[in-house]
């Protein structure tokens, strides 16, 4: 990733980078979406058959790992790891959550008030002297125009005047609201995150943003998100990957990942005191196709 990407993320609080995914990896990921979701033409042919995906703004979310390596690998794409490492200032990265999110127009109103994500990513609040220990990255897996419910993001220079707290729940949408900000706040300052499929949108968890209404009649939007911090803090996070380690998709993920890629899930690194003859043998039994040579 170019140096300007790190600088923009630090200074503006967000980054929009078109062409993040190559043509082949984008096509493979898009095809893998249909292992989890109906294609748009299938959904709109019979919305009632897929009603479970549109009971709320968030009902189209599926947590990783997923049924395809072509999707799973995007959560730890090498260029994403490069960006996170340089921005967070550490190679000791933790992937603390990963989600697929499908949104279909016509039933759910995806409009939100402005909010910051740290509220359910941390037990405390960002430290203003060093306010960026976490980032969220969202990869667009479909084209997103102004009618497709683009995320609206507020530059740090504008949003920093809004206090971190209170952070309240909007019972109508199930989304949070920063400091009671009304609908329409920052209408002249916010940016619509539009772009072609394959675009990367990364933002800090102290950056104000919101979801917006899908206005195209048969619009469908698909994204993959990955959230990163470093391993040191005890007060941040979203999921414990061990809770999902019996999932049928987990074994392939670990078996195909490199030691570097495994490490972002908390897998013991080569050279860790954890490894001995017994743990090597039993871990190999658990992941029979994994190359554990680097851990010997």
What is each of the regions a protein language model found here?
Residues 103, 154-161, 221, 227-233:
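Short edge-strand/loop segments of extracellular domains
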